[in-house]
Each structure stands twice: as C-alpha cells, then as structure tokens.
UniProtKB/Swiss-Prot annotation:
Subunit structure of this chain's protein: Occurs in many kinds of cells as a complex with monomeric actin in a 1:1 ratio.
UniProt note on tissues of expression: Expressed in vascular bundles of roots, hypocotyls, cotyledons, leaves, sepals, petals, stamen filaments and stalks of developing seeds. Expressed in leaf epidermal cells, trichomes and stem epidermal cells. Detected in phloem exudates (at protein level).
Annotated keywords: Actin-binding, Cytoplasm, Cytoskeleton, Endoplasmic reticulum, Nucleus, Plant defense
Any one Gene Ontology BP term: defense response
Protein name: Profilin-2
Endoplasmic reticulum keyword on record: yes
Gene3D superfamilies given in the database record: Dynein light chain 2a, cytoplasmic
Major localization class: cytoplasm
GO cellular component, one term: plasma membrane
Observed phenotype of the null mutant: Defects in rosette leaf and inflorescence development.
Organism: Arabidopsis thaliana
Length: 131
C-alpha cells in the first residue's frame, strides 16, 4: 500500500459522518511521505520543535505548536508518543511512530476525540508494522 493510500483511506476516512480537514505522514526528518491536498507547508523549525517535544515533553507548551505558521495551544498528550493541539473549534493530533510523524488536523463538527482515534489507530498500526 502506498503512503498516499494511508492518508486517503485511513486518515481522511469518514468517522461518524465527519472527516479530518487535513492529514499527512512525514518522516521524522521532515520529509513528506504523503499528504492531503492543502496540508500546511511545514517549516524545518516547526518539525524540529515537534521532534524536541517528543524528546522532552512540555517543550512546546510555553510557545505553542506551529504548523505552517498557524499557532496551536498544546493540550495534554502522551509523552514521547502523541502531541495534541487546540486552535479555536479545531485542533491537531500528531502521533510519533518508529520512523514517521502522523498528522491529523480537524475542525468542527469533528471532535478532538475522533481525530485522536483516527490518527492514533494508524500510528499504532505503523508501529506494530515496524514503521
């Protein structure tokens, strides 16, 4: 299965009638493996900040999480595994796997819980597959 298929079929799938707004899978080095259309263009410093937060939980909390220049308030995640951010009625979930970063960005009516489910389920599958 191609990386784009993971984005299209597993991240952008329908959940209780709702969809993620944007989704992507990046290498931990910041390389784009696959992404939905109009996924924000991430800057190297943004990827570096995300990786640093996975190494040192709470690193992004004082400044916020930035994706394509958009600021998200960091909310409770899972140290070394999941970063969650909130921005207005939407937010983001980022799951770290062995080799990748799985991103899901949502807006209402999708909920943070639905986004977490979609992103973390694929992330856990990739971890189990050694990816």
């Amino acid at each position: 299965m191609s990386w784009q298929s993971y984005v299209d079929d597993h991240l952008m799938c329908e959940v209780e009638g709702n969809h993620l707004t944007h989704a992507a899978i990046f290498g931990q080095d910041g390389s784009v493996w696959a992404q939905s259309s109009a996924f924000p263009q991430l800057k190297p410093a943004e990827i570096a900040g995300i990786n640093k937060d996975f190494e040192e939980a709470g690193h992004l909390a004082p400044t916020g999480l930035f994706l394509g220049g958009e600021k998200y308030m960091v909310v409770q995640g899972e140290a070394g595994a999941v970063i969650r951010g909130k921005k207005g009625p939407g937010g983001v979930t980022i799951k770290k796997t062995t080799q990748a970063l799985v991103f899901g960005i949502y807006d209402e009516p999708m909920t943070g819980g639905q986004c977490n489910l979609v992103v973390e389920r694929l992330g856990d599958y990739l971890i189990e597959s050694g990816l």
